[in-house]
Amino acid sequence: MAFLADNISLHMSGFNILRDVNVAINTGQITVIVGPNGAGKSSFIKVLSGDILPTQGQVILNDKALSDWSPDQRARMVSVLPQHSSLNFPFNASEVVALGRIPHQSGKVRDTHIVKEALATVDANYLESRFFTQMSGGEKQRVQLARVLAQIWEPTTTGNQFLVLDEPTSALDLSHQVLTLKIVSELALT
């Protein structure tokens, strides 16, 4: 298994958020987690990404406990688009997408090329120099998707890569919902 949640439980503020969750995710497959609002889907994603430690169980990434990978190594293998992303700094779209390149040391020229490619992939290249704070909700969502794509744009020597998306189409119009699902499907095949 490349990404494994082994007997995950999460107890917070007196509530059982997750209880005995077991999931195996292999590369090349799309795994969808569905459930009603408040069921713990976003909390599970935070456990998978290492943002929250489980009360019980462990997450295994590429045959190694998630906690045994350094933050930089994890960031080169797992890219997460959270349900809500806020950014109140005067960054333009290119600068936001470039944040996904921070864990890499591929050089400014290569990173600039990847940023442009990622923006084009999500149909947001026209937003390149627009400030993030001046974008619509759907435009922000596409720029953030470009950021997480840029983060795993190139293969890494440390192991398989995973894209974890929490409600990635929630703010998108229909055509960009279709585009997002197409991008995810194509990534799963590579």
Q: Model-found features: residue ranges?
A:
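Conserved structural motif at the start of ABC-family nucleotide-binding domains
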Residues: F3-A5, L18-D20
